[in-house]
């Protein structure tokens, strides 16, 4: 089983492909500044992905894995600040889904 006990999967919908690609470029420039903070707070993994199975939708998915609820809570202030900055730069709709890991099978 994974070390992660709590997972958050968020999606961000952008108005255009250009806005989405610009966000990805900006994240590449910003992530070295931001990622050490949640890592120190107990975040185990952060993954960015392009959702490809929704035609006409410009959506990114973000997977956050935390070692426990305390780590998740510590990191929320950090991610809220990042999200606030992202929304100030361009319009985006963010939807979050949180879950507790019940079963985790690895095949690698």
Where are these regions (language model features)?
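Short, well-ordered beta-strand segments in beta-rich or mixed alpha/beta enzyme
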Residues: 5-14, 45-80
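Generic low-polarity alpha-helical segments
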Residues: 10, 27, 34-38, 64, ...
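Short amphipathic alpha-helical segments
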Residues: 18-46, 80-88
